[in-house]
Amino acid sequence: MSGSHTDAGHVVVIGAGIAGLAAAHRLLDRHARVTVLEASDRVGGKLLPGEIAGVRVDFGAESILARRPEAIALAREVGLADRLQPPATATASLWTRGVLRPMPKGHVMGVPGTAAALSGVLSDEGLARIERDADLPRTEVGDDVAVGEYVAARLGREVVDRLVEPLLGGVYAGDAYRISMRSAVPQLFEVARTHTSLTEAVRGIQERAAAAQQTGPVFMGIEGGVGGLPHAVAEAVRARGAEILTRTPVTELRREPSGGWRIVTEGSGNLGIAGSAGSAGSTGNAEGNAGTGVLHADAVVVAVPAPAAARLLRAEAPEAAAELSAVEYASMALVTLAYRRADITLPDGSGFLVPPVDGRTIKASTFASQKWGWIADQNPDLLILRTSVGRYGETAILDHDDAHLVDVSRHDLREATGLTATPLETRVTRWDDGLPQYPVGHHARVARVREHLGKLPGLAVCGAAYDGVGIPACVASAAAAVDEIHGDPRTVQHLTAHPVRSLHGGAGE
């Protein structure tokens, strides 16, 4: 029995990103009375729907890893089954050494089963270095190792710099030579512990994937945008009696002497909104004035980014707070551009990734109108593109204004694709400290956080800072938090043993 066990009662969820909303959804399945508190003026966190040139798009995450069940199942449960759509094309390119090159097949997160799989992407020297893998002695990985460090030791730096780095960077906006292999690419970590040759291990992964005959798309989108998922979850939990209060930042979280939790909010004009059957105000467990409010709960799920979680936990769980304060984040920006289709011709495919070693400004570009049929169908006369700029350790570009980010994006798009037309409209979306970094030892840090919190009944954490940055990982993290406060540690134990992949690592799809 977990030390954080509590019976179903009133549970406050702090944070209305997809993890917090998924936690609320699961709590209602356990017959809890739920209040969700969100500091900003909207739900959804990093999932942000929007519009450019009259076309609905995503200004945050745009796809869901469909080979994991958690997020797709949640979408179906909240009525989005008929809006799930696979990409119209999954063919991508690499912009490297001055040319757009087809993304190689036959690799796992950029790690090839044979040198031939990367022909055309690597130099002759780089391809020859891969062949040495079979003759090298075993590379020990210990309790964890950086993805880049291990792959470079086995196959050479060129594999890391030209392929592993842009693939990992597309998800974490991080540095492959710092990112934990155990947490970020667990399938490679597992085989690295049991195999000497990395290429042989990758071929084994590919053979098992082929034998399993996995069918269906690797990724899935949602008509109208993935940003519609949190709104659908919010509507579903409200319909079941939960209350969601925006513009309600939590300033203090304290354990009650008699058990339960005291949650102090400020700026909470929404506190105790009339007409919500399960609202804190209508059930007598809220108090306060025009500027502050106090809620009392049997349990709390903290579903906010690590720095905010650290501030809330400092009074009651200082050790956990110290661990969370050390979590680093990457900042980046997305530049979305709308063009007249008649003005431009794009290469085939869904877009391209850019290895940092090539020294370009943009890190990737998505041809959104070619990737997603639902975007193209809204206005066949337009083409929507987006680029990403900035990553961990490379923030100087983000000091520039939006106009400059548009200019450098257009420059790199011209160099890569020949695109010279002037866009009809542009939008820049900045995600400051948007992506948590998973350095070597991340799994141990998360375990320590949960160990500290396990001593406090009715308290758990979830979100992108723990079990993976993808949407399925956030949903799985939420499920683990809910089960934990109800005395069931098995979901957390499963997540610890089997980390959720935040990106596809199959047979080179």
Locate predicted features:
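Glycine-rich FAD pyrophosphate-binding loop
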Residues: 28-52
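Dinucleotide-binding Rossmann-like beta1-alpha1 core, especially the glycine-rich loop
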Residues: 53-138
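N-terminal Rossmann-like FAD-binding beta1-loop-alpha1 element of flavoenzymes
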Residues: 3, 7-36
